[in-house]
Every structure is written in C-alpha cells, then in structure tokens.
Design a protein with these regions (language model features):
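Catalytic phosphate/metal-binding cores of nucleic-acid and nucleotide-processing enzymes, i.e., regions
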Residues: 2-135
Length: 135
C-alpha cells in the first residue's frame, strides 16, 4: 500500500494508506520506475523523478546490491544527513522540496518516482518533509 500525503484546500494534511486519493485535493506519493512495478502514475497524476537523474533530489549514494538491506539502510542514512544539512541552510534540496510542497498545495497530484519503492527509499524522507511543511 502507498502512503499518500494530501493537502486539503485549507492546507491541512492527512495521510492515508490508499493507492489513490479521490477529489480535487493535491497529494504526493512514491512510485516505482521499473517496468511492471506497482505505483505507476495514474490519470491526473504528474510523475516527478527523484532518482539520480534528478541532480537535486536524487540520492547520490549508489546502492550496488539492491538486495543488501544493510547497504540500503546506509545509503538512505547518508542521504538523510545530506538532506537535513541542506534543509538547515536553505540549500537547493530545500528549495526543490518547497517547490513540490507548493505544487501539492495548489492541488497537483504528484508521484515521486524512484527505483526503490516499495523497498525502503530516500524518497520517504522527502515525502515526510513535505508532510511536515503542509501541517
């Protein structure tokens, strides 16, 4: 199941374990770029790449073996340190996160696309920060 962060017209935030949210509210959720993987964008949703093609929000720390849970946790933790340091100084990652937050506030339905989900993914950190900003 996917966690969707929704912004109501009053800019309140709710989280739900639904795969798709109905109505005109904006939201952001994680999706997977692999062919046949779950979480592909549905009609009315906008895909935003957050893999390494995105030089700002992509995780620059390479996971050499996607089945190595320890290595996955390590690259996510390294991204966490870099991400929170960037947020603290209003760097480019903070600006990109705020831009996504504003898009959700205006009602856009965004699917943050990476190769990891539903396995642990750095995208969860980005979504959690957007959720915090919407509260």
């Amino acid at each position: 199941m996917t966690t969707i962060i929704r912004a109501t017209t009053a800019h309140q935030t709710t989280a739900t374990a639904a795969a798709f949210a109905c109505g005109s509210e904006g939201y952001i959720r994680l999706g997977n770029k692999r062919a046949g993987a779950p979480g592909k964008p549905k009609p009315g949703e906008t895909a935003v790449d957050i893999d390494r093609k995105n030089r700002i929000l992509g995780n620059p720390f390479i996971l050499h073996d996607p089945n190595d849970k320890t290595a996955r946790a390590d690259v996510i933790e390294r991204f966490r340190a870099k991400y929170y340091a960037d947020l603290a100084c209003d760097g480019p990652m903070a600006a990109a996160t705020q831009a996504l937050t504003e898009r959700v506030k205006t009602g856009e339905r965004i699917v943050a696309m990476c190769w990891c989900w539903p396995k642990p993914c750095h995208g969860t950190l980005i979504i959690d920060e957007i959720k915090r900003r919407l509260e």
